[in-house]
Curated annotation (Swiss-Prot):
GO terms for biological process: negative regulation of transcription by RNA polymerase II; regulation of cell cycle; regulation of cell division; regulation of DNA-templated transcription; regulation of embryonic development; regulation of transcription by RNA polymerase II. This is Protein Dr1. Residues 152-167 have a biased composition (Low complexity). It holds the Pfam family CBFD_NFYB_HMF. Heterodimer with DRAP1. DR1 exists in solution as a homotetramer that dissociates during interaction with TBP and then, after complexing with TBP, reassociates at a slow rate, to reconstitute the tetramer. Interacts with NFIL3. Component of the ADA2A-containing complex (ATAC), composed of KAT14, KAT2A, TADA2L, TADA3L, ZZ3, MBIP, WDR5, YEATS2, CCDC101 and DR1.
Length: 176
C-alpha cells in the first residue's frame, strides 16, 4: 500500500474517524500528521488482513457470506485472540442497536391493526374531510348569495327612496 492512488483512498478508513478516535483516546496529546497517516495505514492494513483471513475461512466452510463468526475465527488464527472478548461485546452492542432500529421502524406493524383496516380508516378520514370541505364551501356559497341578495335589496331600496325623493320634489314644485 505504498502507492497513493485514487483507488487506495476508497479502501481506507475516513480520516475524520481516525482523528476522532485519536482525540478520544489521547485527548491531551498532539499527534503529527505523519503519525495520523501511519495510524490510517495500519488500520487499513489490519482490516485487509482480517477480512482476507475471514474470507478464506468463509470459503473453506463453503459459505458465500462472511459472518461475524468468520471474523472471530480470523482474529484467533492470526494471533489476535486477546481482542475476541471486546469484539464480541461490540458485536452484541451492534445487534442491540439494530434490533432497536427494527423495532422503531416496525411500530406500524406492532399496532395490531391489519393494514387493510388502517387503509379503510384512512379512506374514511379522507371522506369525512372531503365532506367537511364540501359543507364549508356550501356555507360560503350561501353566505355569498345572501350578501348579494342583501346588496340587491339595499340597492333597490336606495333606488326606491331616491325615486320617492324626486317624486316628492316634483309634488313640492307643483305647490308653488
Amino acid at each position: 500500500m505504498a502507492s497513493s492512488s485514487g483507488n487506495d483512498d476508497d479502501l481506507t478508513i475516513p480520516r475524520a474517524a481516525i482523528n476522532k478516535m485519536i482525540k478520544e483516546t489521547l485527548p491531551n496529546v498532539r499527534v503529527a500528521n505523519d503519525a495520523r497517516e501511519l495510524v490510517v495505514n495500519c488500520c487499513t492494513e489490519f482490516i485487509h488482513l482480517i477480512s482476507s483471513e475471514a474470507n478464506e475461512i468463509c470459503n473453506k466452510s463453503e459459505k458465500k457470506t462472511i459472518s461475524p463468526e468468520h471474523v472471530i475465527q480470523a482474529l484467533e488464527s492470526l494471533g489476535f485472540g486477546s481482542y475476541i472478548s471486546e469484539v464480541k461485546e461490540v458485536l452484541q452492542e451492534c445487534k442491540t442497536v439494530a434490533l432497536k432500529r427494527r423495532k422503531a421502524s416496525s411500530r406500524l406493524e406492532n399496532l395490531g391493526i391489519p393494514e387493510e383496516e388502517l387503509l379503510r380508516q384512512q379512506q374514511e378520514l379522507f371522506a369525512k374531510a372531503r365532506q367537511q370541505q364540501a359543507e364549508l364551501a356550501q356555507q360560503e356559497w350561501l353566505q355569498m348569495q345572501q350578501a348579494a341578495q342583501q346588496a340587491q335589496l339595499a340597492a333597490a331600496s336606495a333606488s326606491a327612496s331616491t325615486q320617492a325623493g324626486s317624486s316628492q320634489d316634483e309634488e313640492d314644485d307643483d305647490d308653488i
